[in-house]
């Protein structure tokens, strides 16, 4: 088979299909998507032989906005004997190189979630059988491809593989984050996931550390402010609404009752700007660009709400506009975007200046 499979948020299949069509054409790999509403995945069938393999290697997974996972399809098995599913699966991968990890997964839908327990239990005997057949390393080996079993029903499975240097490291492409009991709102998980997604661990001590200052636009009740405070930052929380008392008691938060679109810091020393305001994407994009153009921040994470039908087109337009505006400023600006697991009808965008970051990494913090 010459297919790629992409996991995505249910309801965003058409956006995922539009994105992969654009990206594949840019790499001169042509094909078409098979899409079903609210199924949680998209199949992209390539016309050219070996194009699926080429895309899996050349298309940077981190640059895909709507994809939770990307894998090359080996085979689809239907009508599996419920008394012996393992034998045909092992036979299907006999001609493949040895794999370094096994993930037995399903779609992130209410219907498919009923298979979660089965997938977890089935992975144990399947892992043993694959190792006995020499198709899976004794321990997880990050140098080898990951074998994916994607079950639609308990007798129907897609078999595929991904490359560890170009995939999501998470089961089903979903990071497992626990909601902190003292956080003011569940939105806190959006920013925590964004930090995990966009900031490499080796940079935590210079980009997510105490001593930095941050501004949270539209902060109330403080879900995003909470993530900044727990990392030791001093935060200006901008919102006419109330802030959680627990955050105010930390001594790290200054609550400024003002409009998030008109507020600017009196001292242009904030490192972080974060924003989760409910507003049209174009207006948020313009606001973020203004902050960078006025030198009011060095890094930003913000959400673009997507209630419209053509969401991928809206995202691409706003990111292109932001890129144009940032190109007018001295710097080497990087824009990253992802629909995170904890996002809903929205995506999260990260912007930073590579030059300034390089200076921070070298120890020059100005």
Curated annotation (Swiss-Prot):
Annotated GO biological process: methylation; rRNA processing
EC number(s) stated in the UniProt entry for this protein: 2.1.1.186
Active site: 305
UniProt xrefs under InterPro entries: RlmM_FDX, RlmM_THUMP-like, RNA_MeTrfase_FtsJ_dom, rRNA_MeTrfase_M, SAM-dependent_MTases_sf
Pfam families, per the entry: FtsJ, RlmM_FDX, RLMM_N
Localization in the cell: Cytoplasm
Reaction(s) this enzyme catalyzes, per UniProt: cytidine(2498) in 23S rRNA + S-adenosyl-L-methionine = 2'-O-methylcytidine(2498) in 23S rRNA + S-adenosyl-L-homocysteine + H(+)
Residues annotated for S-adenosyl-L-methionine binding in this entry: 187, 220-223, 239, 259, 276
Keywords, in A-Z order: Cytoplasm, Methyltransferase, rRNA processing, S-adenosyl-L-methionine, Transferase
Entry GO MF terms: S-adenosylmethionine-dependent methyltransferase activity
Uppermost EC category: transferase
An annotated GO cellular component: cytoplasm
Entry keyword annotation includes Cell inner membrane: no
Coarse class of the protein's main subcellular location: cytoplasm
PANTHER family: RIBOSOMAL RNA LARGE SUBUNIT METHYLTRANSFERASE M (PTHR37524), RIBOSOMAL RNA METHYLTRANSFERASE FTSJ DOMAIN-CONTAINING PROTEIN (PTHR37524:SF2)
Family to which the UniProt record says this protein belongs: Belongs to the class I-like SAM-binding methyltransferase superfamily. RNA methyltransferase RlmE family. RlmM subfamily.
HAMAP family (UniProt xref): 23SrRNA_methyltr_M
Function description: Catalyzes the 2'-O-methylation at nucleotide C2498 in 23S rRNA.
NCBIfam families in the record: PRK11760.1
Oligomer status and interactors: Monomer.
Protein name: Ribosomal RNA large subunit methyltransferase M
Organism: Tolumonas auensis (strain DSM 9187 / NBRC 110442 / TA 4)
Source lineage: Bacteria, Pseudomonadati, Pseudomonadota, Gammaproteobacteria, Aeromonadales
């Amino acid at each position: 088979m010459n297919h790629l499979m992409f996991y995505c948020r249910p309801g965003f299949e058409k956006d995922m299909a539009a994105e992969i069509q654009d990206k594949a054409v840019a790499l001169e790999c042509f094909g078409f998507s098979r899409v079903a509403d609210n199924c949680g995945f998209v199949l992209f069938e390539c016309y050219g032989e070996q194009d699926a393999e080429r895309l899996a290697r050349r298309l940077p997974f981190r640059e895909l906005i709507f994809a939770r996972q990307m894998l090359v399809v080996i085979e689809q098995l239907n009508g599996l004997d419920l008394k012996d599913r393992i034998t045909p699966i092992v036979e299907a991968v006999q001609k493949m190189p040895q794999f370094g990890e096994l993930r037995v997964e399903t779609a992130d839908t209410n219907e498919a979630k009923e298979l979660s327990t089965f997938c977890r239990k089935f992975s144990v005997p399947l892992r043993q059988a694959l190792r006995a057949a020499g198709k899976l390393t004794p321990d997880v080996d990050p140098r080898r491809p990951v074998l994916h079993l994607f079950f639609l029903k308990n007798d129907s499975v897609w078999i595929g593989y991904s490359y560890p240097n170009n995939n999501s490291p998470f089961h089903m492409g979903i990071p497992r984050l626990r909601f902190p009991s003292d956080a003011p709102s569940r939105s806190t998980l959006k920013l925590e996931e964004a930090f995990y997604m966009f900031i490499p661990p080796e940079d935590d001590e210079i980009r997510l550390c105490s001593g930095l200052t941050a501004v949270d636009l539209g902060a109330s009740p403080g879900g995003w402010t909470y993530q900044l405070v727990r990392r030791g930052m001093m935060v200006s929380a901008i919102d006419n609404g109330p802030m959680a008392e627990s955050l105010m008691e930390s001594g790290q938060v200054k609550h400024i009752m003002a409009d998030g679109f008109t507020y600017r810091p009196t001292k242009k020393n904030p490192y972080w700007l974060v924003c989760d305001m409910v507003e049209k994407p174009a207006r948020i994009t313009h606001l973020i660009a203004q902050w960078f153009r006025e030198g009011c921040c060095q890094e930003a994470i913000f959400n673009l709400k997507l209630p419209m039908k053509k969401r991928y087109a809206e995202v691409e337009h706003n990111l292109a506009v932001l890129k144009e505006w940032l190109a007018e400023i001295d710097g080497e600006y990087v824009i990253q975007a992802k629909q995170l697991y904890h996002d809903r009808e929205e995506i999260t965008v990260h912007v930073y200046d590579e030059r300034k970051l390089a200076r921070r990494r070298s120890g020059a913090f100005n």
